[in-house]
Amino acid sequence: MNRRGEERRCIPNVSTVRVRLMFQDEASFGRINKPKYCWCPKGTRPSVPCHHIREYRYAYGAVEPQTGESFFLVMPYCNTECMNIFLRELSKTYPNDYIIMAMDGAAWHKSGTLEIPDNIELFYIPPATPEMNPIEQIWSWLRMHGFCNEIFVSLEKVVERLCETICSLDHATVRSITHRSWILSAV
């Protein structure tokens, strides 16, 4: 049974269904930038443009550390409606696989209106343990490789850069960032 007390389908035949262990999270990307370290000529002080415009978009992501496969959507909000869209699209992307997905306990992950597809099973990591969710390091990588020391003139430019940076992630990079021996030994 799942957390709502409803029957969940069992994996019909493990030899014919691929089981994936994926880790899911969301992160905000917006027009508020954070200056990072940078190179500059000796004896000079670096100058980095900065502004504080509170406009955001949210990247929803799921990664599979064993293979380095990943799935991302950029959404306007962090809420149950967007989470339902994410789960539906993830399920459509892997229709013949059974996905066991670890995630934090955000309110929209446990909402009564959350629609969990039949080929996805959710489980929650303990509160205040981001180190147990390897996708957290993917967000750091995206910020470091796509958002350092730059201002964006519009929210659309933020989304463009976010999509470009996500598309630059390959399986080997995702695997190297999300590799945890305790995950791989469990799979």
Name these PLM-found stretches:
Residues 1-187:
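Short functional hotspots at interaction and active-site rims
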